[in-house]
Amino acid sequence: MATKFPKFSQGLAQDPTTRRIWFGIATSHDFESHDGMTENNLYQKIFASHFGQLAIIFLWTSGNLFHVAWQGNFEQWIKDPLHIRPIAHAISDPHFGQPAIEAFTRSQFPGPVNIAYSGVYQWWYTIGLRTNVDLYNGSMFLLFIATLALFAGWLHLEPKYSPKVSWFKDAESRLNHHLSALFGLSSLAWSGHLIHVAIPESRGIHVRWDNFLSQLPHPSGLEPFFKGNWSLYSENPDSLTHVFGTASGAGTAVLTFLGGFHPETKSLWLTDIAHHHLAIAVLFIVAGHMYRTNFAIGHRIDDILNAHKAPSGKLGLGHFGLYETINNSLHFQLGLALASLGVITSLVAQHMYSLSPYAFLIQDRTTMAALYTHHQYIAGFIMTGAFAHGAIFFIRDFDEEKNKGNVLSRILDHKEAIISHLSWVTLFLGFHTLGLYVHNDVMQAFGTPEKQILIEPVFAQWIQSAHGKNIYELNILLSSDSSNAFSASQAIWLPGWLNGINDKSTSLFLQIGPGDFLVHHAIALGLHTTTLILVKGALDARGSRLMPDKKDFGYSFPCDGPGRGGTCDISAWDAFYLAVFWMLNTIGWTTFYWHWKHITLWQGNVGQFNESSTYLMGWLRDYLWLNSSQLINGYNPFGMNSLAVWGWMFLFGHLVWATGFMFLISWRGYWQELIETLVWAHERTPITNVFKWTDKPVALSIVQARLVGLAHFSVGYVFTYAAFLIASTSAKFG
């Protein structure tokens, strides 16, 4: 007899109903719950899966390089990055009629193509790639690395080469390795690449393997390094008239602290970036020697944590016992990693446009919008995941005895104060922000716009002025040429910063007003509400007033009947589920704000944002409706254009999103009737009745239906906005 899915759970495999399929999928990655799972096995499976993920990442990036080299226009694009659209890949679609072939044939390519809005062209150009052969070489190298990663994953599952649990739990060695080897040496290698390849290429000097050892990146070579005359490497930087990619106006400096942007490319100075990575490398290589391993130097993390007690004694035992708790909980470690990664991803979104590192990226408007939105959504999903695994930690891994009196138990002890304060903040933000918006809408509707409540963000303007923004004329610190801070900035550090912050063509410290003040608080409401739901879900995961024994029910349970007052919404999973909706709301408001402000800036029409962003109808009419008009005319009875695919995706995204509500607003009886009706029809229809339905149809559980609904809501939401964003921006700016 064939083994039924899932192999990892004999109990589920023998289930005669469709529950077998859904629960099998739901628990396929929950290794801890699988039959015969040992701690040793668990760690090895996760370790091997890391190599699998690395292989997928390298294969994906290899594919990007390969398709651009094969079907792109990289060599043509670098001759005129501001006017030639970069091609991602060709389109070979048998459904295309002549109008579609003509609409999608662009960028001097003989057939239909997709335009690249990922920024890879700018990235590859900045780091010194110049020909299709360079791209092919990179692609083949990454393919080799992907193969190596797959082999490593397989190898480490073999008994002879599989590490023991003690190896995985050697936190000091792992941290030293990650800090020094992964962060430190990779940063050093990257600064080396920038100094030896990218900076010379930006000055018209072609460096490859054939002349790598003979072409000095600096005229003095390593002599200043060994003599301690390091400042020599910062002398004679590229001039303000430097033409990127040529020797015209080029200097010889390789490590600088200029600040601001290259006047032509509007990106950070490559020599500043190289300096940054070298400094990071030194810091991390030193940091990788902090913890005690085989040698009798450095600290034990356990000792550090146990010593962390407040002298006043008012904070209990502080971090006592945390080492064992964290080191023995994969969920705690994953939660910390996801929280860090979420913050970093959001910072990438912010810095990619405000301090753009890649040449000519900021002039590619659609790519800027796509990269910001992409990274903010990813940050949102990662952050919610951090809290989900925090909740699982409290249910599965938290030991009350081992953590008595320390910071973890104290947080649990006063969770009601934390939750109620967060609740108060969200209520305050919600009522006041919505109140201001609605008041302004009423004033607009009643024909008295002068009665709107418009609040200038004076504190934020003061902070911008302190950093050198001149437009507000507040004359404070860097915005006052008579201050000591101003003098220091000109003589000691970042002389280009003030030009950068006051440059109208970049997005560093944009001018803000009442519309920004309101949307800032709307976003703050979203952030605090999402946090409230996630924090409450994690802190109540073990038990709440209504359900003190909640931890015995696990991470996701459907209902425990009306006896406790109805418990359908209080599992930790439900908190995660609700938080994702709020997260999507928040990222929506954030990206709406970023996009609308920038398209008005880029069009020289900033007054539209300033006037219309102070009331809700302004957002609906002048941002959403106005910018979707071209999109929904991508195809109509008279024909189609190159926005047609985005118009179709806009529709498709709405449909997926709306399908989510069918799963979210329904009772279990509805699903039982629906599934039985579907099976009945399936078994009585020619052709489909050839396939026998062996499992008894059982309705989705409440938790399952919510998951399916949430997935459709999220995917549809992202698809809809992606289509809107790319189409509305590319229609205006290419």
UniProtKB/Swiss-Prot annotation:
Q: Does the keyword Plastid apply?
A: yes
Q: Where does chlorophyll a B1 bind?
A: 654
Topology versus the membrane: Multi-pass membrane protein
- Which GO terms of the molecular function aspect are on file? 4 iron, 4 sulfur cluster binding; chlorophyll binding; electron transfer activity; magnesium ion binding; oxidoreductase activity
GO biological process annotations for this chain's record?
A: photosynthesis
- Catalyzed reactions: reduced [plastocyanin] + hnu + oxidized [2Fe-2S]-[ferredoxin] = oxidized [plastocyanin] + reduced [2Fe-2S]-[ferredoxin]
Q: Where in the cell is it found?
A: Plastid, Chloroplast thylakoid membrane
This protein's UniProt keywords:
4Fe-4S, Chlorophyll, Chloroplast, Chromophore, Electron transport, Iron, Iron-sulfur, Magnesium, Membrane, Metal-binding, Oxidoreductase, Photosynthesis, Photosystem I, Plastid, Thylakoid, Transmembrane, Transmembrane helix, Transport
Chain residues that bind phylloquinone: 671
Q: What EC numbers are recorded for this enzyme?
A: 1.97.1.12
User: Which GO terms of the cellular component aspect does the record hold?
Assistant: chloroplast thylakoid membrane; photosystem I
Recorded family membership: Belongs to the PsaA/PsaB family.
The subunit structure is: The PsaA/B heterodimer binds the P700 chlorophyll special pair and subsequent electron acceptors. PSI consists of a core antenna complex that captures photons, and an electron transfer chain that converts photonic excitation into a charge separation. The eukaryotic PSI reaction center is composed of at least 11 subunits.
- The protein in question is named Photosystem I P700 chlorophyll a apoprotein A2
Origin species = Euglena gracilis
Q: Which gene encodes it?
A: psaB
